[in-house]
Amino acid sequence: MWRLLSPTALLLLVSAGTRAADLSKAMVVLEPEWNRVLVSDGVILKCEGAYPPGDNSAQWWHNGSVIPHRAPSYSIEAARSEDSGEYKCQTGLSEASDPVQLEVHTGWLLLQAPRWVFQEGDTIQLRCHSWKNKTVQKVQYFQDGRGKMFFHKNSDFYIPKATSKHSGSYFCRGLIGNKNESSEAVNITVQGPPVPSTSTFLPHWYQIAFFLVTALLFVVDTGLHVAVQRDLQSSVKEWKDGKVTWSHGP
């Protein structure tokens, strides 16, 4: 089958396969990294992905509807409840990103974390965020209703190496002025170590190497085929011309 394809055609196939391997998903990145914010908080969403030379525009979606905004970042200066929902983006050289959920809450305190599902051994960071960054004192973090950490001044709570026992419902409490305020409870899940997937053993560079090796083998095979045919044609011509000399053993 390979001999039916010209080198140009094979190179086109290799190029197409390489481009397909190169086409990756864009990614929405939140700054700050919290996906739960309070009303009036500022949020910047950035679209990370491959951009064509000279074109850094991006397409944005909010809850499935196109946002009339083409910049690589999308800013929400003062979040409102209607800003909640799923956000997606796409660059000129990438597939559409997976959706990222943004939740806009009302209240005095809000528990924040970079994510809510962790692997065993991960560091868990919890933040007791106040509306308009008002001063909070005597902050306490709770897991399943039990106090886990207390700070006289508002500070983040870190769990260095998460285990399954750290899964549960968390909230924070603190004093704003002379009022004792509490955040809503949020569930945190700690999963076991991830199982290696097949894709782990077939990284992106492996796919490119596969196409290159295939092309190289084709070139070698084609060269041998041409050389053998040329030698056979030469031998047949010499035989017809009577130039072949037979040697007999002693």
Swiss-Prot record:
Glycans are attached at N63, N133, N180, N187. Residues 1-20 form the signal peptide. It is a single-pass membrane protein. Residues 32-105, 120-189 form the Ig-like C2-type domain. The chain crosses the membrane at residues 208-228. Its main location: membrane. GO terms for biological process: antibody-dependent cellular cytotoxicity; cell surface receptor signaling pathway. Keywords: Cell membrane, Disulfide bond, Glycoprotein, IgG-binding protein, Immunity, Membrane, Receptor, Repeat, Signal, Transmembrane, Transmembrane helix. CDD domains: Ig2_FcgammaR_like. The record marks D221 as: Important for receptor turnover. Residues 229-250 are cytoplasmic. One of its GO terms (cellular component) is external side of plasma membrane. Disulfide bonds join C47-C89, C128-C172. Residues 21-207 are extracellular. Coiled coil: none annotated. It is found in: Cell membrane. GO terms for molecular function: IgG binding; IgG receptor activity. Forms a heterooligomeric complex with ITAM-containing signaling subunits FCER1G. Interacts (via transmembrane domain) with signaling subunits; this interaction is a prerequisite for receptor complex expression on the cell surface and intracellular signal transduction. Binds the Fc region of antigen-complexed IgG. Receptor for the invariable Fc fragment of immunoglobulin gamma (IgG). Optimally activated upon binding of clustered antigen-IgG complexes displayed on cell surfaces, triggers lysis of antibody-coated cells, a process known as antibody-dependent cellular cytotoxicity (ADCC). Does not bind free monomeric IgG, thus avoiding inappropriate effector cell activation in the absence of antigenic trigger. Mediates IgG effector functions on natural killer (NK) cells. This is Low affinity immunoglobulin gamma Fc region receptor III-A. It comes from Felis catus. The gene is FCGR3A.
